[in-house]
Amino acid sequence: LTRAAWPALVDSGRGRIQVLVSMSGKRSKGSLAGYTASKFALMGLCQTMRNEGWENGIRVTAVCPGWVNTRMAAGVKTMPPEQMTQPEDLASLCAHLLTLPSAAVPFECAVNASLER
């Protein structure tokens, strides 16, 4: 999707790209090597898009949530669903990020539902 939109963003001289990555793109925890590696790769893609788009006014934010109360997290035993980040709260955060001026767009936005140790 980003590849398809890229030329139009460049032509417009501005644009915002938000990528939902994961906290697993910022640190390795547990034994899910493939999942973690894919999220680290996604962070690298975000950094490259940021670097390539900066001079054209394109801003990229990698949103990195921990546990979000979705079907993917349904089997998590270490945290009750009500303590996880709620999808609507993540959506509100993403909407707010779009209101920021280009000079204040964060590259990374870590969202923790619990204290990371």
Regions from the language model: what does each represent?
Residues 4-13:
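A short helix-coil junction within the Rossmann-fold of NAD(P)-dependent oxidoreductases
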Residues 22:
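Residue(s) in the substrate-gating loop at a strand-loop-helix junction
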